[in-house]
Amino acid sequence: MTESLTMAALYGKLSKIGLKKDYVRKNGLPSWWDDELNDKPVAVLEGAGYIAKNLNLDLSSLLTPQEKVKFNRPPHTKFKQHNSQNNQHPHLAQALASRFAELIYLGVEVNYTPLPKDAKTIREDILSHWPKVDLTSLLDYCWSQGIAVGYFDHFPNKTKKFAGLIQWYSTCPVIILSSKYQQSARLAFNLAHELGHLALAHLNNGVLVDEEITFDNDREEKEANQFATELLLGDCDNCLGDRKFPNTEKFSIYVQEHFISHHPDIDIGAIILNYGWHNNYFALAMATLKVLEPNPNGNKIINEYLANKLDWDKFDDETYEYLEKVLGV
C-alpha cells in the first residue's frame, strides 16, 4: 500500500471533502514537514497519521486509494438550526471542532457537577465571587463546575460554521464556541446559552451543535435563550424599553450613566445586546459594542483561560504544536 503513496494523492483526496492543500499543510502536518518527503512512501505514511489525528479523519479511508476520505464517526449529534428548511449541517466544522474538544478533554482534569436548573441561582453564585456576570466570570464558573470551554475557528475557507457546540465525555461536557463575532458580550451570551442547554438537560450525552443562536420557534432554543438572559441580566430583561438613540455615543453614554450606575452587577455589553434584540436595533447594538471594545478579544480570553488549565505534558510534540496553533497562544 505504501509503494505508490504520495502526498499529492492524499491532497487530492482531501480536497474532495473540503480540506484543501494549504489548509492540510498548515493544520494537518507538523511544522518540521519538508516537501522533499512528499514522494517518499514511508514518510507520507507517517504524515498521513498526523493529518488523520489532527483533522479527525479515519486513517484507513485516507490511505485506501479508491475510498472516499471519512471523518471519524461522531457520537449521536443533535443539530439546532435557525432555518428548519436547511438540511445542510456543518459536518466539516463539527468534525474539526470535535477533535479540538477531544484534546481538551484529554488535557484537563475536571469532574462535572450538575448545574442548578434556575439561572438566577447560578447568577447569585457567580456574584458571590465576582462583581458582575460577564465572559470572564462565566468562564470561571464553568471551570469550577467541571465544564471545559474553548474557542475554535481554524476552519477551511467557506466552511459552514456553527455558533456553539457541546460534546459530552465520561466525566465532563466540553463547550466549544465558534462565533465569528469575537466581542466578549456576544461570546458571553453564547456561553450562557450553552449552559442553559446543560442546566435544562437538553443534552445528556453525545453532541449538540447550535448552528446559529437566534430567537426562534424551537422550544429548547427559546428555553436556552431565556436562561442566558436571566443569567446575564437577572430581572433586567428589556429594561431599556423602546427608547430611541440617534448614535452609538449617545447610546453608550446613556447606558453608562442611567443604567450601569444603578446596576453595576450587569455587564454593559449584555444590556446593549439585549436592547438591540428586543428593538430590532442589532446594527446599533453591535456598532456600540465596537466603540466600547474596539479590539474584541473574547476568543483570546477563552483560550488563554483554557491554556492555563491544560496539562501540556500529556501531549506529544506534534499535538502540542497543533494545540498552540488553534488556541492562538
Say what each PLM segment does.
Residues 1-191, 196-329:
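Active-site hotspot residues in diverse enzymes, especially metal/ion-binding acidic/histidine motifs
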